[in-house]
């Protein structure tokens, strides 16, 4: 499975010209971004952007917050949000209405009407079958480890744009880095919890207390996840060691 994507700042969502052939997807970037792709597919420039409620287990986020909806509406687009899509982040249907969105009763209504579907996590099997060749899907996909999803999306014919493959002019991953920051920090919180004796751990308090040494934390890898894990552990008072094969990276740290 091959995805090629290059992010241009100021271009939202960003990609156009995606082609699907079997399970091979190639994405090319252009100055008009997804609006150009929509024009190629439908002959229109204005989008109807759909935001379904996330249905993956333990996923509480939402594809667009009300302020993002307001920005899209200001730029001439329409937004259709499934009812209660923002409940997990404390955003009510009324807030979305105030931002200019219409509220759909079901996810089926969103998939049936939207030009672009904006999500957080990868679509589930009952969502693949609702996608069509005339639609753009913009979300995290993580296709390398999910062949069934790759085949499902290819079969739908939709233009699927993965957040995690978008790169900036410096080769960075601006839409993946925030998730890595969260993962690194939460890793230390979870690890500290499992050090407690009642969780089967050694009864070590990561910060230590007067008379008791803090925990020794080893972080393997000095990338975005590792750096944020190290920052969190240092902030909690642990003694931290980072292993990495890159000497320049270790010097930076």
Summary of predicted features, one role per range:
Residues 48, 54, 125-216:
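Glycine/serine-rich phosphate-binding loop and adjoining beta1-alpha1 elements at the start
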Residues 5, 11-15:
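Cysteine-centered motifs
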Residues 74-78, 101-102, 116-119, 155-159, ...:
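Generic secondary-structure signature for well-ordered alpha-helical cores
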Residues 52-87, 201-253:
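Glycine-rich phosphate/diphosphate-binding loop of Rossmann-like nucleotide-binding domains
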């Amino acid at each position: 499975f091959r995805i090629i994507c290059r992010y241009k700042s100021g271009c939202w969502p960003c990609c156009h010209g995606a082609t699907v052939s079997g399970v091979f997807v190639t994405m090319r970037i252009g100055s008009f971004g997804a609006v150009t792709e929509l024009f190629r597919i439908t002959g229109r420039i204005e989008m109807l952007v759909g935001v379904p409620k996330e249905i993956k287990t333990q996923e509480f986020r939402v594809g667009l917050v009300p302020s993002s909806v307001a920005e899209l509406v200001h730029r001439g687009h329409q937004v259709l949000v499934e009812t209660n899509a923002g409940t997990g982040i404390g955003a009510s249907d009324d807030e979305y209405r105030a931002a200019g969105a219409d509220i759909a009763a079901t996810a089926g209504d969103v998939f049936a009407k939207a030009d672009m579907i904006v999500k957080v996590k990868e679509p589930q099997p009952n969502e693949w079958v609702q996608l069509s060749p005339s639609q753009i899907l913009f979300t995290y996909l993580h296709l390398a480890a999910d062949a069934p999803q790759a085949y499902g999306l290819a079969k739908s014919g939709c233009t699927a744009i993965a957040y995690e493959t978008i790169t900036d002019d410096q080769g960075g991953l601006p839409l993946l880095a925030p998730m890595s920051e969260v993962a690194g920090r939460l890793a230390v919180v979870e690890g500290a919890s499992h050090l407690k004796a009642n969780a089967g751990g050694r009864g070590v308090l990561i910060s230590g207390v007067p008379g008791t040494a803090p925990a020794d934390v080893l972080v393997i890898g000095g990338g975005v996840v590792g750096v944020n894990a190290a920052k969190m552990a240092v902030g909690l008072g642990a003694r931290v060691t980072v292993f990495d094969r890159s000497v320049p990276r270790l010097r930076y740290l």
